[in-house]
């Protein structure tokens, strides 16, 4: 089935291409053949346009109200792969149906350039929105009957695309990633560095949206990264378990890598922007990465319940991360100074001093303020006692200062980080932005900060 769901209202409606249930029927007997994981893709150029794939490419421009077939059969249409699944109960749940499309993607840089891949090794391309299709499968040096697991059209060049080919159902567990730079006329295998094992077959390859040549790939047990456009791959795991990586999405606003794994699990690596500079950083004895923009978020208290939460995730650290690379630990340590746009020192932080990539979080606060001391009792509260020194603390919940133990959060604006490593000093500028969910103006926030100081 296929549904359109409105997140604003919670309403859903069925928008399947053809009102025919395939359960119990051999695929060869159906009008359209659908895989259990049939491809669905949104057009990056035309609002409301969506593509889905059976053995054909179907297009809608009205969010599923009507559909148009824009291709011939783009599979081998081998009838021997379209029979009943067998077993005691012939369910035909489309889990193993052959001769179906498995991947559809439209180019992000050239409208109407669409790539398709099938689960029987067929790759097609059209450059006119489906009027004419070219089969480029024969140009790829790959074994027969592979599943074109995903297609990644490049956002830097219309003629370039990447594909991953999954052969494990044919008893071949090797990694297959291919790249073309001429609209599929020629292809190069680019999977060097992914070790061969029974879990090496590739589910997905993804291009970094901001750094040409930086690629990510997911196999059946790991995540890999390439800094040289696929010529060489290296394991990219950290604390991620050896899970089958089925899908990758990069959240471009915060540069977070979202990893979807088999079993409906997902993992998030926060802020992968430093990977775009890593090749240059690794050649230096010390290097400070660009600092991304930070939001002055206000924490939102969740509704308290007694039921245990099954959510294993947690929010990233609050504030702005300062990332730097050290080839070796340095004498004298690392010190970080934060200045505002008036070149006034806001905060001094002590950095970690270990070989490799270091990350220090600035919580967007000034140095701790002086503790307020009230020397009078509150009006009408004669029972309130002073301490031995003759004063009582000001409880500044509304000012978010925690009795003077914290400094106020800075107002939105431009800031500079001076990172002192050994005898070197590096300077990076960055923005602190207002929480878009708050109603206070930047002027009001500035006045509150001045008052808190």
PLM feature spans:
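Beta-propeller blade termini and top-face loops
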Residues: 1-310, 317-323, 329
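Extracytoplasmic/secretory ectodomains and luminal regions
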Residues: 279-453
């Amino acid at each position: 089935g296929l549904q359109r769901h409105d997140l604003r209202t919670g309403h859903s409606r069925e928008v399947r291409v053809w009102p025919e249930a395939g359960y119990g029927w051999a695929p060869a007997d159906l009008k359209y053949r659908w895989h259990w994981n049939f491809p669905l893709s949104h057009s990056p150029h035309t609002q409301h346009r969506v593509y889905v794939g059976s053995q054909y490419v179907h297009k809608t421009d009205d969010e599923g109200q009507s559909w148009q077939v824009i291709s011939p059969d783009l599979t081998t249409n081998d009838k021997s792969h379209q029979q009943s699944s067998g077993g005691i109960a012939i369910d035909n749940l489309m889990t193993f149906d052959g001769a179906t499309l498995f991947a559809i993607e439209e180019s992000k840089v050239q409208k109407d350039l669409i790539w398709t891949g099938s689960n029987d090794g067929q790759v097609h391309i059209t450059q006119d929105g489906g009027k004419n299709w070219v089969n480029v499968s024969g140009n790829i040096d790959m074994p027969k009957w592979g599943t074109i697991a995903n297609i990644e059209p490049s956002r830097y060049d219309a003629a370039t695309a990447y594909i991953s080919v999954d052969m494990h159902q044919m008893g071949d567990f090797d990694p297959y990633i291919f790249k073309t730079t001429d609209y599929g006329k020629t292809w190069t295998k680019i999977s060097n560095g992914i070790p061969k094992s029974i879990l090496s077959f590739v589910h997905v390859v993804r291009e970094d949206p901001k750094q040409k040549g930086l690629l990510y790939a997911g196999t059946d047990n790991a995540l890999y990264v390439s800094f040289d456009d696929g010529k060489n791959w290296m394991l990219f795991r950290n604390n991620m378990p050896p899970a089958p990586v089925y899908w990758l999405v990069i959240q471009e606003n915060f540069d977070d890598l979202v990893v979807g794994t088999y079993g409906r699990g997902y993992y998030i690596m926060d802020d992968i922007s430093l990977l775009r500079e890593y090749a240059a950083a690794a050649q230096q004895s010390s290097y400070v990465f660009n600092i991304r923009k930070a939001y002055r978020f206000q924490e939102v208290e969740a509704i308290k319940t007694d039921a245990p939460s099954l959510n294993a995730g947690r929010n990233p650290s609050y504030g702005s991360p300062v990332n730097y690379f050290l080839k070796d630990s340095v004498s004298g340590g690392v010190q970080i100074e934060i200045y505002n746009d008036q070149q006034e020192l806001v905060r001094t932080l002590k950095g970690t001093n270990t070989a490799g990539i270091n990350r220090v979080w600035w919580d967007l606060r000034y140095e701790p303020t002086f503790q307020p001391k009230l020397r009078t009792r509150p009006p009408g509260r004669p029972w309130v006692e002073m301490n031995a020194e003759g004063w009582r603390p000001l409880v500044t919940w509304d000012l978010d200062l925690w009795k003077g133990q914290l400094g106020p959060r800075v107002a939105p604006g431009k800031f500079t980080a001076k990172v002192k490593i050994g005898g070197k000093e590096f300077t990076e500028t960055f923005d602190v932005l207002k929480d878009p969910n708050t109603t206070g103006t930047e002027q009001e926030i500035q006045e509150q900060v001045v008052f808190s100081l």
